[in-house]
A protein has these predicted regions:
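An intracellular "coupling" helix at the cytosolic face of ABC transporter transmembrane type-1 domains
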Residues: 20, 113-114, 130-139, 143, ...
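Transmembrane helices of ABC transporter permease
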Residues: 20, 24-37, 41, 48, ...
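Hydrophobic alpha-helical segments in the permease module
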Residues: 70-82, 175-182, 248-262, 268, ...
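Cytoplasmic juxtamembrane "membrane-exit" helices immediately C-terminal to transmembrane segments
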Residues: 87-91, 95, 99, 162, ...
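ABC-type nucleotide-binding domain
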Residues: 330, 337-582
Length: 582
């Protein structure tokens, strides 16, 4: 029952999106009616032609030519109607698919970071790409065959009744058995298609992970283990696909067997009727054609039901993404932070990603305007988490963080984040020109401003050596640029914006020592008068910080300037000395 309810709910959502194109749907149904009506008229014309051939006396060639001409005209009009119907069905299907993909991507852009962190990237990609494509295939099949199938059943029934009612009764009684068989099988294939979709998403996620981290895989000679893992996932996908296809493939032969029985019954009873004189040979020929056309849609509809089951499973996964709760909206009275002074305070902040595993327990922070605050500590101590809280990628569980005296939960996220310039250890560059990537935070920047920012970030030199300089097109994630060059472009992006507050999370980790010295000098100029948060593992980069926070297990265990902390001989001193040990 839960599966049936889920199917019903998903179907309603699909129909709701189809309703946006109701004019196309009406035109498709009308053209289907024209196509079916004309197709069903052909057997009558053929029957008349046959009766003209075998009628007593001479063959009526004129009548035969007339009927054949009618058949040619009717067939041509039917073909035109079918062609137009297919165009409309394709347009309607891919408009619905476009809308769903747009909805899914729009929702993805509004999801909280917690969702992105909790779900493999490949699984989400699979929902937006693979599942939508699978859904499109099933929906197109439904449009192209379901409408015409239903109309054909109704039309042939009317025509058969007009020819011979008793034989029609035999057809009507036997044929629906194929629908019961199809329904019986379809109910059992839903769970198999669902498992197939899950296995496909897992495989997509794994392949994407391996492609993105192939250097690490090869560096640690992990190829064999990954091949074994891929083979295991691939085997499960193969098994779930074969099971789904095996059971769904029973549908067509089973319905065809029933329809063959119907055809045989019509031929037998029709022959007796022809001998008895209650039907002409031409009429029997037309009836046999109708019986075949009547049973054919049952075969097609049974196939459509199977495909539609797969489409509904994919639609469920798409709608699950579309209906994910978005990031909590800004408060109705949230203010816009125009240009922050940069006074940041945290009061008794507590936060955890999972309720049973507290990370930050009671953190207090007081950063003055223009102060350079460095955050250090071992991996997993909460440094990046603190940055996430400052940017409101996550909200605190308890306590508060304020900027210029206003709780950041009462500031719009967009305006808060625009006041920060952020350079992360993980670089991100979009496909486009070098210039496009630099001006992301300031689209109206002049050429002089772009070049000045690049010179300050020491990226101008390598940019001018590229084939087309600032107009050089780079691929996704920087293409062939080195990691250091990509990092320099990200730094240039921030240099151009000149925001009042900065976050540098291992910003120079991918840059050689000589370039790092230039960058540190540029950063010193950039940070002048700007509140800055610097996350660093290389402690040599934070000697000039106004305040250093030493974190461990989510708590601040030491704070002070570099020389003070080294003189104390505590945890920071141990970290510092371990990095510079001979």
């Amino acid at each position: 029952m839960p599966k049936l309810k889920a199917n019903s709910s998903t179907l309603k959502k699909v129909l709701g999106r189809i309703a946006r194109y109701r004019l196309n749907a009406v035109l498709s149904i009308l053209l289907s009616a024209v196509y079916v009506g004309l197709s069903l008229y052909v057997p009558i014309l053929a029957g008349r032609a046959i009766d003209s051939i075998i009628a007593p006396g001479s063959v009526d060639y004129a009548q035969i030519m007339l009927e054949l001409t009618k058949i040619a005209v009717v067939a041509a009009i039917a073909a035109l109607a079918q062609w137009l119907m297919n165009i409309i069905n394709n347009s309607m299907t891919y408009n619905v698919v476009k809308d769903m993909r747009t909805e899914a991507f729009d929702r993805l852009m509004k999801l909280p970071l917690s969702y992105i962190d909790a779900h493999p990237y490949g699984e989400t990609v699979s929902r937006i790409i693979a599942d939508v494509d699978q859904f499109a295939d099933g929906l197109l099949l439904g449009f192209s065959q379901l409408f015409t199938g239903i109309l054909t059943i109704i039309g042939t029934l009317i025509f058969m009744l007009s020819v011979n009612a008793p034989i029609t009764l035999a057809v009507v009684i036997l044929t629906p058995l194929s629908l019961f068989v199809a329904r019986f099988i379809a109910r059992r294939t839903h769970s198999m298609f669902a498992r197939q979709g899950e296995d496909r998403a897992e495989q997509t996620a794994f392949v994407e992970e391996m492609i993105g981290n192939q250097k690490v895989v090869q560096a640690f000679a992990h190829e064999q283990a990954n091949e074994e893992r891929f083979d295991e996932i691939n085997k499960r996908l193969s098994e779930s696909s074969l099971q789904a296809i095996f059971y769904s493939s029973i549908t067509n032969p089973a319905t065809r067997f029933i329809n063959s029985l119907v055809y045989a019954a019509v031929g037998l009873t029709g022959a007796f009727a022809a001998v008895a004189g209650s039907i002409t040979v031409g009429g029997l020929s037309a009836f046999l054609s109708y019986a075949n056309q009547y049973t054919k849609p049952f075969n097609e509809i049974s196939g459509v039901i199977t495909e539609f089951q797969n489409a509904l499973v994919c639609a469920e996964r798409i709608f699950a993404l579309i209906e994910e709760p978005t990031e909590e909206p800004d408060a109705s009275d949230a203010c816009v932070l125009d240009h922050a002074e940069g006074i940041v305070r945290a009061n008794a902040v507590a936060f955890s990603y999972a309720a049973d595993r507290p990370l930050i327990k009671c953190l207090d922070l007081d950063v003055k305007s223009g102060e350079r605050m460095a955050i250090v500590g071992p991996t997993g101590c909460g440094k990046t988490t603190l940055i996430n809280l400052l940017m409101r990628f996550y909200d605190v569980n308890a306590g508060s963080i304020s900027v210029d005296g206003t709780d950041i939960r009462n500031i719009t996220r967009h305006s808060l984040r625009r006041n920060y310039g952020m350079v992360l250890q993980e670089t991100w560059l979009k496909e486009g020109t070098i210039r496009d990537n630099i001006v992301m935070g300031k689209p109206d920047a002049t050429e002089e401003e772009i070049i000045a920012a690049a010179k300050e970030a020491h990226s101008h030199g390598f940019i001018t050596r590229l084939p087309k300089g600032y107009d050089t097109v780079i691929g996704e994630d920087g293409g062939s640029l080195s990691q250091g060059q990509k990092q320099l472009l990200c730094i240039t992006r921030v240099m151009l914006c000149l925001p009042p507050m900065l976050i540098l999370d291992e910003a120079t980790s991918s840059i050689d020592t000589r370039t790092e010295q230039h960058i540190q000098h540029a950063f010193a100029q950039l940070m002048q008068g700007r509140t800055s948060f610097i996350v660093a593992h290389r402690l040599s980069t934070i000697k000039n910080a106004d305040m250093i926070l030493v974190m461990k297990d989510g708590d601040i265990i030491e704070k002070g300037k570099h020389d003070e902390l080294v003189a104390r001989g505590g945890f920071y001193a141990a970290l510092y000395n371990s990095q510079f040990a001979q």
